[in-house]
Amino acid sequence: IKAINPDVPVVMVTKSEEESIMNQAIGNKIADYLIKPVNPNQLLLSIKKNVHKNVIISETTTVGYQQEFGRIGMQINDSLTTDDWMEVYKKLVYWEIELENSQVPMTDMLRMQKQEANNAFGKFVKKNYVDWIQHPEIRPLMSPDLFKKKVFPMLDNGDKVFFILIDNFRLDQWREVKDLLAEYYTFDESLYYSILPTATQYARNSIFSGLMPLQIEKMFPELWVDEDSEEGKNLNEAPLIQTQIERFRKKYTFSYHKVHDSQYNDKLLNIVPSLLHNQLNVVVLNFVDMLSHARTENKMIRELAQSEAAYRSLTRSWFQHSGTLELFKRIAGKGYKVIVTTDHGTIRVDNPEKVIGDKNTN
């Protein structure tokens, strides 16, 4: 049957409970396996699961979001803490992905709620950001705190760490690729707040230095590149990591690699065995950031990623078919804790405004 029409779901009904037959059935991509005696409800459930599954999931998801819509709206209005906003964001990301395949169009409803959340969150950040900068002891986890509060405690505990930063990688994109790693890893997720501006030259330098940009400029002027300079703004990341390790009086051995293309990714895969003697290995993956810029500048990519769902799909395809997944596979089982994070995300602009001025205008 599969040879003639591989898309037809096949349900096997048998008396046999032999494991070898079960394995053979699973290996031949059987849709379901029922052992006699079988009651009518079992048959009905199997048919529904294989024939009407997508319709049932779509209907259930739509009803679920309609019920949750009001609760999320109340949560947006009542959010007073950084943890509250993290929960709002996680819920919106969850429903955005769940509604992706819904046959009932709910995207406008979700987009409206995301806009409402963005407006309220902007006011929240405006009200609290200065306090976060002036009082680091009471602020949420932010870019300069990642190494101090997440990486160093693991290293101090005797763990070895791979710190993999995927540039411009959003939570919804992480959720899109997470299942590809489930076979090799268990997960402990948490969110953090990027500094402002969230642009790479500020946010990522802040992560690797453990400092705010102004502090980097004052303490290490030779490692800071001004906004109006033609020089690359993220060329000193390895030295910044070194300064942070020395500032906290650690003696960890570390490596740093930035992957721009598949050729360098292959090179990195080849030297993984030589990296295993380091206590800390830092890897920056740039593809997602390149993809986000191409979505603006390249017509073909713009067509391929014209919706957020399509953008996530492209991210998954890259993760699965590039050397990135292979990198995670090779690290797995080598005694390393792996931290996957990002420096910032991206927002798809629906109503652009053209601003004309000198390139140094802020």
Predicted regions and their residues:
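Alpha4 helix (beta4-alpha4-beta5 surface) of REC/receiver domains from two-component response regulators
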Residues: 3, 16-32
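The C-terminal output helix
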Residues: 20, 48-61
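His/Asp/Glu-rich, glycine-adjacent segments
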Residues: 56-133, 137-140, 179-186, 193-310
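Beta-strand elements within well-structured catalytic alpha/beta cores of enzymes
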Residues: 158-177, 207, 281-284, 324, ...
